[in-house]
């Protein structure tokens, strides 16, 4: 057999192998065209999501759409030869329609954590995860040692009664409820360490927290939209100017 003929058969084998690999994708038709609905179903089987008011959520809370777009890009780039970016955005739009959820009632009986879900009833902690609006970037560790440095810091900043008040308030923030209708204001001299509590809130709540100015929320009608689906808003530099009536 000549080298040319052997190379030709090798190329043919490679082409046939590529065709077989392409056929393994249930979201690609016989002509190599991506079927958007089938691809959305394929994506949701490995990555369950829901869509609330044009925002996508999964088991970790609000979806990073840049990361999701890259995942779609990685799947489609070998099949879509032209207008790939347009097709990717069309897929995301189709995904929002496919996962449309008209309403999501606040889950007041559980806290979503990195290593599972903590139920406030007799079930306690379970390692399973589910779709949620927020998942805190911390783990539940029942045998964790006492946070001695944090307790020492609070002891030097607040009186014992105020430490209990702070602890109670932080507990309210763990569930998506405004039933208490309370906000926490800490006043004092500069340099005492009050801002560290704000930093702790950002670390504890992650994407479920939002830094914003109360004055801006009062004067900018678009600012409050950033608070939707958040558990806490932190204003670590409160402006003492009177709010407009």
Would you name each region that the model predicts?
Residues 47-62, 66-68, 112, 117-231:
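P-loop NTPase catalytic core of nucleic-acid-dependent motor ATPases
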Residues 30, 34, 63, 82, ...:
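Generic amphipathic alpha-helical segments used as scaffolds and interaction surfaces in large
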Residues 223-245:
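Conserved nucleotide-sensing/catalytic segment adjacent to the nucleotide-binding pocket
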Residues 2, 17, 239:
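Short, flexible active-site loop motifs that bind/organize anionic cofactors or intermediates
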Residues 35-39, 72, 87, 146-150, ...:
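Alpha-helical structural motif
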Residues 13-137:
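Intein modules and their embedded homing endonuclease domains
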Residues 30-35, 202-207, 242-245:
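A short, contiguous, amphipathic alpha-helix enriched in charged residues
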């Amino acid at each position: 057999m000549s080298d040319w003929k052997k190379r030709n058969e090798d190329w043919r084998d490679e082409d046939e192998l590529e065709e077989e690999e392409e056929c393994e994708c249930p979201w690609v038709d016989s002509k190599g065209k991506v079927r958007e609905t089938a691809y959305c179903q394929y994506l949701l089987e490995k990555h369950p999501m829901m869509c609330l008011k044009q925002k996508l959520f999964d088991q970790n809370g609000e979806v990073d759409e840049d990361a999701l777009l890259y995942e779609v890009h990685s799947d489609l780039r070998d099949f879509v030869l032209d207008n790939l970016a347009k097709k990717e955005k069309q897929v995301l739009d189709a995904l929002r329609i496919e996962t449309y959820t008209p309403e999501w009632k606040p889950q007041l009986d559980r806290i979503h954590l990195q290593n599972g879900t903590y139920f406030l009833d007799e079930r306690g902690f379970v390692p399973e995860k589910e779709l949620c609006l927020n998942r805190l970037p911390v783990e539940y560790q029942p045998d964790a040692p006492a946070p001695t440095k944090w307790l020492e810091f609070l002891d030097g900043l607040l009186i014992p009664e105020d430490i209990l008040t702070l602890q109670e308030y932080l507990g309210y923030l763990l569930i998506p409820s405004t039933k208490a209708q309370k906000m926490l204001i800490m006043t004092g001299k500069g340099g005492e360490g009050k801002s560290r509590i704000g930093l702790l809130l950002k670390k504890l709540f992650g994407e479920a927290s939002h830094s914003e100015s109360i004055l801006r929320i009062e004067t900018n009608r678009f600012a409050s939209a950033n608070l939707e689906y958040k558990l806490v808003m932190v204003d670590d530099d409160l402006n003492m100017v009177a709010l407009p009536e």
